[in-house]
Amino acid sequence: PFSWPLLAQLPRGDGHPVLLLPGFMGDEGSLSALKLFLGGRGYDVQTWGLGRNIGFQRRHAQALEQKIRHLHHSTGRRVSLVGWSLGGVFALYGALQAPECVRHLVTLGSPVNVGPEGSQASPLVKVLYRMVAHPMGPEVHVMQPRVKRLREHLLPDVPMSCLYSLSDGVVPPQEATVDGPAGRCENIRVSGSHT
């Protein structure tokens, strides 16, 4: 509530499509406040329409790419992707697969920079991921060809903004930020927790 006066001062959107991607175990409802805010600022806000995010899966990745391409072609405008936590990994993947359709990539506390040695996330996060998504935990995705491509070609040819917090508690700051060319990539430190 204390941030509403500051948020009200932000510039209005130009009506271009913005696709919101939920974090691990989140669904469209988990981003309802963000959807309401961005819609009120003049953006054409869409949700991913794939239900609960239960991990980085091929069917979701393919459906996301199709949705990005459909939004781009149906509106005639490039799409901004906003992904929270694991949703940011999906957004990064979508931007790499369809850069000609993406205007801007925004990640919110997303593990977009996990090295081949695996995530430094807390043990609790890893246990939860093992229980829901895959028994090997988040490290299983580091070995997959799709994620290997993310590591090798981390930066899509679109502007990218990574929001991170030193007090995130789930995704370490070094995994939520990227090094890239100035003017195309920015890391923005914010105050707050992961949720």
Regions found by a protein language model. Name each.
Residues 6-9, 95-96, 148-153, 176-178:
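Short, flexible, glycine/charge-rich loop motifs used to bind or transfer phosphoryl groups or to couple energy/partner
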Residues 16-22, 27-29, 33, 39-52, ...:
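Serine-dependent carboxylesterase/thioesterase catalytic core
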Residues 156-195:
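C-terminal catalytic-base region of ester-bond hydrolases, centering on the histidine
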